[in-house]
């Protein structure tokens, strides 16, 4: 009976969780064999029949056999191989003519493959880059048999380590060969011209001149050679080219190309760069404390996921608005946009099998999945508006549909005031002393305020006098004179009885070096012993930090500590330029003994 009642309660709990969920489980196939990420998912009405399909740039198991898949419902409708791993997929309108069927763009390697009605329409290739002159000269020598393959390999490895420009594909393949295969490779390819080709790292779309959903859009490409390219949607020519300090990995755009637009690029150096129309270089820079794993624009806020398991919100000018800590590592991110309710939120797939939905820093919903989610896509699928499509780390496919009655509220599924609001505070009772002090403040409030102001003015006066005295007697670790702009910083290391005292002396001048300085230590000789209490300072070059080290021996076995004064003087002068008081720690070594 106990077991039966337990199973009944579990079944009731599962039914109640399903009833309280905002999502309907439409499909789950753990063996769908789809390996991709969010940038390679796109939803579009590819045939103009009102039936939205899912476009997947599939990496294949283990990154082998990349393919372009188009799904209708839970089934794969078409499948075609790709020459290289896909980087991004996007759908866009190329022209205003009827019927207005969107085209599909798939970035793979150095090319963008454009499909219309799922048939190949156009192939755009990135322009070739000029080869490294040294690399070109080496292959010319190999062509004339002036160098052997082993020397060619050594020289190419030297160029790869020192040159800023990467080697060509031909040279990189040659460096991967065994010694026995090199000669045949050189004989086969030495007559070929050296070609250096970059690849596409990310892609998105930008409206051309109208903000409507069915307006013509341009393709925006991020490349491995730290450039952003904007392509014309009809002629596929380069309309604009922008340079970045690093390789872009995520892109977000807003506005129209012909009017005004903002472009945010998250790069491999951990920074986000903001560019505007007619700017060849970034206008703003957002420095992150960790590498970005996703970039989503929600209204006017840039939401960034980082490898520190956190979401950050920034303005387009780089001001941080908020930070939310995640319970696990972020694997993927995408935008959830519910047009019927005007909702925009961020979806984050975590390594612990959760998909969290946030509006700003407020948690709206948590979805638990049987496996970690690696890609997310939300939109119209089939003929259902609000459909969430997820692929898992093991290649599974999950499709959920948002209920029409579902309303996202802050705090997940909790509705109403938080539970802490109903708790009564433990307010202490009013004592006789509290009542007397309150009456005194009411009766003598003016006199108390005047007394406070008088004491405050005296405190400021004493602080100013002490500061002036410190400046006049050089009792500060910063020099205030223009002739010797110095900065002193002292660090004590060790447990005792021998301590290491390191003085960091820096010349803060911009152009003039400093010479002829002395360092003097003043200390209690009954407590401490120094091998050198007075020594000369070498030439101080502007801007460099000079560590000056010495050792301090503690002579007391009672754990007593004192202050050691450090003075920096000009040779031939008795007044110090600057000074520092070092609070020595107690000797733990002697105390333990």
Swiss-Prot record:
Keyword vocabulary terms for this entry: Acetylation, Bardet-Biedl syndrome, Cell membrane, Cell projection, Ciliopathy, Cilium, Cilium biogenesis/degradation, Cytoplasm, Cytoskeleton, Disease variant, Intellectual disability, Membrane, Obesity, Olfaction, Protein transport, Sensory transduction, Transport, Vision
One annotated GO molecular function: phosphoprotein binding
Gene Ontology annotations for the cellular component aspect, listed alphabetically: axoneme; BBSome; centriolar satellite; centrosome; ciliary membrane; cytosol; motile cilium
Modified residues (N-acetylalanine): 2
Tissue specificity: Highly expressed in the kidney. Also found in fetal tissue, testis, retina, adipose tissue, heart, skeletal muscle and pancreas.
Subunit record text: Part of BBSome complex, that contains BBS1, BBS2, BBS4, BBS5, BBS7, BBS8/TTC8, BBS9 and BBIP10. Interacts with the C-terminus of RAB3IP. Interacts with CCDC28B and ALDOB. Interacts with PKD1.
UniProt-recorded name of the protein: BBSome complex member BBS1
């Amino acid at each position: 009976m106990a077991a039966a009642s337990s199973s009944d309660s579990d079944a009731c709990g599962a039914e109640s969780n399903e009833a309280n969920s905002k999502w309907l489980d439409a499909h789950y196939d753990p063996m769908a064999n789809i390996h991709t990420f969010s940038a390679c998912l796109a939803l579009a009405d590819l045939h103009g029949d009102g039936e939205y399909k899912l476009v997947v740039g599939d990496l294949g198991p283990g990154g082998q056999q990349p393919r372009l898949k188009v799904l209708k419902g839970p089934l794969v409708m078409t499948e075609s191989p790709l020459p290289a791993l896909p980087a991004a997929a996007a759908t866009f309108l190329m022209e205003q003519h009827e019927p207005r069927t969107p085209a599909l763009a798939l970035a793979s390697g150095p090319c963008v493959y454009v499909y219309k009605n799922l048939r190949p329409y156009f192939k755009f290739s990135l322009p070739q880059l000029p080869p490294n002159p040294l690399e070109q000269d080496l292959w010319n020598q190999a062509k004339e048999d002036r160098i052997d393959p082993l020397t060619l390999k050594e020289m190419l490895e030297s160029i790869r380590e020192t040159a800023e420009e990467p080697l060509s594909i031909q040279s990189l393949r040659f460096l991967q060969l065994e010694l026995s295969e090199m000669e045949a490779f050189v004989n086969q390819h030495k007559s070929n011209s050296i070609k250096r080709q970059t690849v596409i790292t990310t892609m998105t779309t930008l409206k051309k001149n109208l903000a409507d959903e069915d307006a013509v859009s341009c393709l925006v490409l991020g490349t491995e050679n730290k450039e952003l390219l904007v392509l014309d949607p009809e002629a596929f020519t380069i309309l604009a080219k922008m340079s970045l300090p690093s390789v872009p990995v995520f892109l977000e755009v807003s506005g129209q190309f012909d009017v005004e637009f903002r472009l945010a690029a998250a790069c491999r150096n951990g920074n986000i760069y903001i560019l505007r129309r007619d700017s060849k270089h970034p206008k703003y820079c957002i420095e992150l404390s960790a590498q970005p794993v996703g970039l989503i624009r929600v209204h006017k806020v840039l939401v960034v996921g980082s490898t520190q398991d956190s979401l950050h919100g920034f303005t387009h000018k780089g001001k941080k608005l908020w930070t939310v800590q995640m319970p696990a590592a972020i694997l993927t991110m995408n935008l959830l946009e519910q047009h019927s309710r005007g909702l925009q939120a961020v979806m984050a797939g975590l390594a612990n099998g959760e998909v969290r939905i946030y509006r700003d820093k407020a948690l709206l919903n948590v979805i638990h999945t049987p496996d970690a989610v690696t890609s997310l896509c939300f939109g119209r699928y089939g003929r259902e508006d609000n459909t969430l499509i997820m692929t898992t780390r093991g290649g599974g496919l999950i499709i959920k549909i948002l209920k029409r009655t579902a309303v996202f509220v802050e705090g997940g599924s909790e509705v109403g005031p938080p539970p802490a609001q109903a708790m009564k505070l433990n307010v202490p009772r009013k004592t006789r002393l509290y009542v007397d002090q309150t009456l005194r403040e009411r009766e003598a409030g003016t006199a108390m305020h005047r007394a406070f102001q008088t004491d405050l003015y005296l405190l400021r006066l004493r602080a100013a006098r002490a500061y002036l005295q410190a400046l006049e007697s050089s009792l500060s670790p910063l020099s205030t004179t223009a002739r010797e702009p110095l900065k002193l910083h002292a660090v004590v290391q060790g447990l005792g009885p021998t301590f290491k005292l390191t003085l960091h002396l820096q010349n803060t001048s911009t152009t003039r070096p400093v010479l002829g300085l002395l360092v003097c230590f003043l200390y209690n000789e009954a407590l401490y012993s120094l091998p050198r209490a007075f020594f000369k300072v070498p030439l101080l070059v502007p801007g460099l930090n000079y560590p000056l080290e010495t050792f301090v021996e503690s002579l007391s076995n009672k754990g007593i500590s004192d202050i050691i004064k450090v003075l920096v003087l000009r040779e031939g002068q008795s007044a110090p330029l600057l000074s520092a008081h070092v609070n020595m720690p107690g000797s733990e070594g002697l105390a333990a003994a």
